[in-house]
UniProtKB/Swiss-Prot annotation:
Subcellular location: Plastid, Chloroplast
Impact upon substituting residue 226 to I: Loss of activity
Disulfide bond sites: none
Chain's role: Catalyzes the NAD-dependent reduction of a carbon-carbon double bond in an enoyl moiety that is covalently linked to an acyl carrier protein (ACP). Catalyzes the last reduction step in the de novo synthesis cycle of fatty acids. Involved in the elongation cycle of fatty acids which are used in lipid metabolism. Required for normal plant growth.
Assembly and oligomerization: Homotetramer.
Name of the gene this protein is made from: MOD1
Reactions it catalyzes: a 2,3-saturated acyl-[ACP] + NAD(+) = a (2E)-enoyl-[ACP] + NADH + H(+)
This protein's UniProt keywords: Chloroplast, Fatty acid biosynthesis, Fatty acid metabolism, Lipid biosynthesis, Lipid metabolism, NADP, Oxidoreductase, Plastid, Transit peptide
Disruption phenotype: Premature cell death in several organs, chlorotic and curly leaves, semidwarfism, distorted siliques, premature senescence of primary inflorescences, reduced fertility and decrease in total lipid content.
Origin species: Arabidopsis thaliana
Any one GO MF annotation of this record: enoyl-[acyl-carrier-protein] reductase activity (NAD(P)H)
Protein name: Enoyl-[acyl-carrier-protein] reductase [NADH], chloroplastic
A GO biological-process term: fatty acid biosynthetic process
Length: 390
């Protein structure tokens, strides 16, 4: 993983560091901002351990979870420096994270999982039921191995994959047409309540909860043309799903833990084309973040924040239809003129999940090269002279 954010923070990992163009300080310590670039890991020795998927194929009312579906590696280095680390370490060793909404290897959810893993956290994943088989198969066949590489050269280990559809809180909420849908055939225990019960049964508790879920069936429609059904579907899948996740996972979260979601600037700015109620859903998500920060903080000492990330050309974002235009606009008009990477959002999430952010809660953190701060479009002909001077 190429961490591109310039920082003196260090990510402490559970695995030995390897000689590379990255700045290696000490076995198990990596500096965020060091760029492995074209690092070669020719001497990487990997042992992949695969075991059966659990809690995905059982049809009983009470969740019964099989052995974890895991991917682990052992990285060996010729040498490592025994220098004392400097700066502030991001150390999540001994912490366990559940990331809801990962279905491939090129979105923000995946990048967050990688950064948390690089900091030493154990990774659990919740995957949308219709995408589950493809995701599992891709993992088993090593199709994601290249994007699983961590700063120390080892591969991110996904301890367990759970089936999840966060639109449904419990089995009683699932309508008959969904139960009989062939895309859900063979899977069980995938409502939010059941997923939380399975995680509790398998691991007991978690420390970090990540919500990387959004869906607007009418996102391409202007708000004036959006149906009530489409609007409420966007709210349900994109914002209330976070409330439901935290509600059901909070009882198994260790005090001092953190919950993180992903939002977008359309919550407070007009983004033509981002319709179907999605802008409303993001606004609701940010408002809920503040309320949940109070409630979860007072009840369980859990911090709740959301990251307002800039546009990324992920597979999911392609559904918006103009994501490439937004990426270009962001590049041309942001204070920092560069392309935003998923790793930068992942590193911000690792910070928010760490003790370094112990006093940050109820906040919307912008990771968008500063685009949110701009009041004008610099690529407009009106500002041609200003751009030439700069």
């Amino acid at each position: 993983m190429a961490a591109t954010a310039a920082s003196s923070l260090q990510i402490a990992t559970r695995r030995p560091s390897m000689s590379s163009p990255s700045k290696i300080l000490k076995a198990g310590t990596y500096i965020v901002g060091a760029n492995p670039g074209n690092a070669s890991w020719d001497k990487l020795s990997c042992t992949r351990q695969l075991s059966n998927l659990g809690c995905l194929r059982n049809h009983s009312a009470v969740p019964t979870c099989k052995r974890p579906f895991s991917f682990s590696t052992r990285a060996m280095s010729e040498s490592s420096e025994n220098k004392a680390p400097s700066g502030l370490p991001i150390d999540l060793r001994g912490k366990r994270a559940f990331i809801a909404g990962i279905a491939d290897d090129n979105g923000y959810g995946w990048a967050i999982a990688k950064s948390l893993a690089a900091a030493g956290a154990e990774i659990l994943v919740g995957t949308w039921v219709p995408a589950l088989n493809i995701f599992e198969t891709s993992l088993r066949r090593g199709k994601f191995d290249q994007s699983r590489v961590l700063p120390d050269g080892s591969l991110m280990e996904i301890k367990k994959v759970y089936a999840l559809d966060a639109v449904f809180d419990n089995p009683e909420d699932v309508p008959e047409d969904v139960k009989t849908n062939k895309r859900y055939a063979g899977s069980s225990n995938w409502t939010v309540q059941e997923a939380a019960e399975c995680v509790k049964k398998d691991f007991g508790s978690i420390d970090i909860l990540v919500h990387s879920l959004a869906n607007g069936p009418e996102v391409s429609k202007p708000l004036l043309e959006t149906s009530r059904k489409g609007y409420l579907a966007a709210i349900s899948a994109s914002s209330y799903s976070f409330v439901s996740l935290l509600r059901h996972f909070l009882p198994i979260m260790n005090p001092g833990g953190a919950s993180i979601s992903l939002t977008y600037i359309a919550s407070e700015r007009i983004i033509p084309g981002y319709g179907g109620g999605m802008s409303s859903a993001k606004a609701a998500l940010e408002s809920d973040t503040r309320v949940l920060a109070y409630e979860a903080g007072r009840k369980s000492n859990i911090r709740v924040n959301t990251i307002s990330a800039g546009p990324l050309g992920s597979r999911a974002a392609k559904a918006i239809g103009f994501i490439d235009t937004m990426i270009e606009y962001s590049y041309n008009n942001g204070p920092i003129q560069k392309t935003l990477t998923a790793d930068e959002v992942g590193n911000a999430a690792a910070f928010l999940a760490s003790p370094l952010a112990s006093a940050i809660t109820g906040a919307t953190i912008y990771v968008d090269n500063g685009l949110n701060a701009m009041g004008v479009a610099l690529d407009s002909p009106v500002f041609k002279d200003l751009n030439s001077k700069n």
